[in-house]
A protein has these predicted regions:
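Active-site lining segments of carbohydrate-active enzymes
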Residues: 193-265, 273, 277-280, 296, ...
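Extended ligand-binding clefts on enzyme/binding-domain cores
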Residues: 213-230, 281-293, 297-445
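Solvent-exposed loop and edge beta-strand segments that line ligand/cofactor-binding
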Residues: 93-122, 164-184, 233-247, 278-291, ...
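Carbohydrate-binding surface patches
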Residues: 444-517
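C-terminal motif of bacterial Sec signal peptides marking the signal peptidase cleavage site
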Residues: 17-20
Length: 582
């Protein structure tokens, strides 16, 4: 009896040891084939290393923007840039407004009872500030997160976030008549709510939005070919504004986030229905900002929900500049007047090219986390963002020569944290033709009496924290360390720190990566292998020329497992595309 027991015990120890060794970092089976990088065609036309190269301190810019714009004590012409709205629309509380542009005569505390202010500026600035470490729920005695609930239009029966608190305040920009404004502000609100889920009343607003979006999605089915949707009557409509089929990606984002938050499959089904409607389009319907969210949701649903969406289709529609409902809308590629401007987002045709600050900042929100779920696009996204981040400094009046901007003599009021609305190749402003690139804005055209200073875009500049919270420089010029988790909102599961680094140089580079004080094993999801182990402090990582790495900081000595095409460390997914032939 004793001999049999001893034999059994030894056998169990051997088996246990075998299983253990199969799950440690030394012996996990390699993938049957390593994923290959896929080039986004539009990105291949961009320089590997943009010139002249000057990387703006995006985090400092975002912090300084918040300190300037959210300062009620600022004095001088057109200041302060913020005020309190005491009209208590939709909720019995005060809210606040920030100017759309410096000096906007349509807005302010003494115009229309202080009600004229846009959600797109307030919500974007909260997300941006939060990404660089500022708590907007408790700042100088104000809870700005709670205050933006007033944009939830329940008084008119729509029960979604809208660009204004009510029809009385509609001064331009969309309000019930321009689809992207109504949908994107809900994407932004869900972004705010991701960071502040416990602020009073936020959850109930989120749930109401999700239910309205789901009802609307069922009403629309596979047809989003409308200019707007009346959420009070659940009726779509058309007007002089082009149809905007890409809003379906905005629906998908909100509904998938609601699915993760509330764990109710009806929202997942709604998200899938919306994304399939967009994927089924026969031509590029990229209108404003939703198509990159389509790429992000496609990658996530493929990785997390067994989908089979065409990620490249959404990426091409985002980048190629061949939209049919907004002619030429996409990513600009080129060198204007000796400046590489590739990567900025806007019209590839208007004025020879017109890239916008807000759109460019916001593009990083979905595209960076997308590579977590589909690392085949790591190199392309790294290259695009290097170009975009370099070119975007030219939106700022102190980062572009005076001769290449509309208002060099009036730039002091910007403190170089408020950018021009955009950058054009061929300006048509009197006295400035032939200058390229040229920083300007459309503010003076919005209404009679607008001062020149309305070229400086407060609403767009508030989104700069998306760059500030995701981009950091390294000890090698041109190699950025890009945070792929910062804007990966409503994650289904826990995740380890994940960074994308792209080497734009023609030779191999060794870059220093800060790891922190806890021991980690470095996994590269591009090569699909561990490249260093048991590290703390700083580590040197080699990157081949014109290649990228996607680094995951895995706790040292984690137990590994590979199943269902996923590689996990201590149960946390570190690779969504790890395929092993068994």
């Amino acid at each position: 009896m004793k001999n049999n027991f001893s034999f059994t015990a030894v056998l169990l120890l051997i088996i246990t040891g075998f299983v253990s060794c199969r799950t440690n970092t030394e012996s996990i089976l390699p993938p049957s084939s390593v994923v290959s990088q896929i080039d986004i065609p539009r990105v291949t036309g961009m320089p590997d290393m943009p010139r002249p190269y000057v990387m703006k301190d995006w985090k400092k810019t975002a912090v300084d923007f918040d300190h300037y714009v959210y300062d009620f004590s600022q004095k001088g012409p057109f200041l302060p840039l913020i005020w309190i709205d005491t009209m208590k629309r939709n909720f019995l509380q005060n809210t606040y407004g920030i100017y759309t542009a410096i000096g906007d005569v349509r807005e302010g505390p003494h115009v229309n009872d202080g009600e004229n202010h846009e959600a797109i500026g307030a919500l974007g600035s909260i997300i941006g500030a939060t990404l660089v470490g500022i708590d907007k729920s408790e700042q100088d005695g104000n809870n700005y997160v709670a205050m933006v609930k007033n944009y939830f239009n329940k008084d008119n029966g729509w029960n979604i976030i809208m660009n204004f608190t009510g029809k009385k305040a509609h001064i331009g920009g969309g309000y019930g008549n321009d689809y992207w404004y109504d949908i994107y502000n809900n994407v932004l609100f869900y972004g705010v709510s991701h960071f502040y889920p416990n602020v009073e009343g936020i959850d109930s607003v989120q749930r109401a939005i999700a239910d309205q979006f789901l009802a609307s999605a069922h009403k629309l089915g596979s047809n989003y070919s409308y200019s707007f949707f009346d959420f009070s009557t659940m009726t779509p409509g058309k007007n002089h504004i082009p149809t905007q089929e890409d809003v379906a990606a905005g629906y998908a984002f909100v509904l998938y986030a609601a699915y993760i938050k509330y764990k109710d499959d009806k929202y997942l089904k709604g998200a899938e229905m919306a994304l399939k409607a967009l994927e089924a389009q026969k031509e590029n319907r990229n209108y404003e900002l939703f198509m990159p969210f389509g790429a992000y949701l496609a990658a996530r649903l493929n990785a997390e929900a067994g989908g089979n969406y065409d990620v490249m289709k959404f990426l091409n529609w985002t980048f190629e500049g061949k939209s049919v409902n907004r002619d030429g809308w996409g990513i600009i590629v080129g060198n204007w007047g000796g400046y590489d401007v590739s990567g900025i987002y806007g019209s590839t045709k208007d004025k020879g090219g017109y890239g916008f600050a807000m759109n460019t900042f916001d593009l990083a929100w979905p595209l960076l986390p997308m590579v977590r779920y589909d690392q085949r696009y790591a190199r392309s996204i790294g290259k695009w963002l290097l170009n975009a981040a370099n070119a975007s400094r030219l939106f700022y009046p102190y980062d572009i020569p005076d001769s290449l901007q509309a208002l060099p003599g009036k730039k002091a009021i910007t403190k170089n944290v408020i950018a021009y609305e955009g950058l054009v190749k061929e300006p048509d402003l009197k006295g400035h033709t032939g200058k390229s690139p040229f920083a300007q804005g459309d503010g003076p055209l919005w209404a009679p009496g607008m001062p020149d200073e309305t070229m400086f875009s407060v609403y767009g500049s508030g989104h700069v924290g998306i760059f500030g919270g995701t981009i950091r420089t390294t000890d090698v010029e041109g190699i950025l360390m890009l945070d792929c988790l910062a804007t990966d909102m409503y994650r289904k599961e826990n995740a380890f720190p994940t960074y994308l680094l792209y080497n734009p140089h023609k030779d191999k580079k060794s870059v220093t990566v800060p790891l922190g004080s806890s021991s980690v094993d470095l996994y590269d999801a591009v090569s699909q292998k561990f490249i260093s182990k048991n590290l703390t402090g700083n580590s040197s990582v080699e990157i081949a020329p014109n290649q990228a790495v996607l680094l995951i900081f895995v706790p040292a000595k984690s137990k590994l497992s590979a199943e269902n095409n996923q590689l996990k460390a201590n149960g946390t997914i570190i690779d969504f595309n790890y395929k092993i032939n068994k």
